[in-house]
């Protein structure tokens, strides 16, 4: 819709181009004349907007706590540089509420290390009090197998547990700098998850004072 009917330049990661939309994919829109520009980061999208002031540029912001700070940085930089033709269409989500929604559906959560590197482990530790068990895992084969072995060993004891199996990257506090940046620019909102429906407070949107960079408000 934005690319074809509003003549907006869409900046997006390459893996989103062929994802089916409600009516068509970005690849379909591009074949019909829509301007779809592949970027590798939100910073690339902000730079493109700066270099093409005659175009209205919208970055498709997706992902979880790991990718959200980079989007916030691009908005902060755009404001500092006085760029007004840049905004984000935000579909970022946060994991804590998803854990709460799914806590009765699994024996053990294998928590993603890259997310916990940002959020820390406090929530995971708190979920143990609600009977939710889990381990934080890294991404190499050895790290994943270690996390699975630890999880199974603890599970056999029959008590809720939490173990951080990725301590070289994940700490209890997480990245305070990234957390502060996101909290400054964004606030929680309800969000729809495919297959799960609406999960209250699991989405993010720009705060009112940053609304000029929210494509939905533009």
Where are the regions a protein language model picked out?
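Metallocofactor- and cofactor-centric catalytic cores in central/energy metabolism, strongly enriched
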Residues: 1-54, 68, 75-81, 89, ...
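A generic structural motif
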Residues: 39-40, 86-93, 135-139, 165-167
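Internal helical hairpin/lid segments
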Residues: 145-218
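Phosphate/pyrophosphate-binding betaalpha-module
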Residues: 60, 64-122
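Short, ordered loop/turn segments at secondary-structure junctions
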Residues: 15-17, 41, 64, 93-94, ...
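A conserved active-site cap/scaffold subdomain adjacent to cofactor or substrate pockets
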Residues: 103-167
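Predominant activation on well-ordered alpha-helical scaffold segments within soluble catalytic domains
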Residues: 1-4, 46-47, 68-76, 96-100, ...
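Short glycine-rich or small-residue beta-strand-to-loop segments that form or flank ligand, phosphate
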Residues: 9-14, 56-62, 109-111, 135-137
């Amino acid at each position: 819709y934005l690319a074809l009917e509003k003549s907006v330049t869409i900046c997006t990661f390459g893996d989103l181009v062929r994802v089916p939309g409600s009516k068509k994919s970005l690849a379909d829109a591009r074949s019909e004349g829509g301007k779809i520009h592949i970027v590798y980061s939100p910073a690339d999208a902000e730079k493109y907007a700066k270099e093409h002031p005659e175009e209205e540029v919208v970055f498709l912001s997706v992902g979880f706590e790991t990718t959200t700070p980079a989007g916030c940085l691009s908005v902060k930089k755009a404001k500092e540089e006085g760029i007004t033709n840049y905004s984000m269409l935000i579909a970022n989500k946060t994991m804590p509420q998803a854990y709460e929604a799914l806590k009765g559906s699994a024996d053990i959560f294998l928590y993603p290390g890259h997310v916990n590197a940002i959020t820390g482990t406090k929530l995971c530790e708190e979920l143990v009090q609600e009977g939710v068990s889990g381990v934080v895992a890294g991404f190499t084969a050895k790290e994943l197998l270690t996390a699975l072995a630890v999880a199974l060993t603890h599970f056999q004891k029959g008590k809720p547990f939490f173990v951080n199996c990725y301590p070289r990257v994940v700490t209890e506090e997480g990245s305070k700098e990234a957390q502060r940046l996101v909290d400054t620019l964004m606030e929680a909102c309800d969000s729809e998850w495919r297959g799960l429906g609406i999960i209250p407070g699991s989405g993010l949107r720009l705060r009112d004072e940053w609304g000029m960079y929210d494509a939905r408000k533009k």
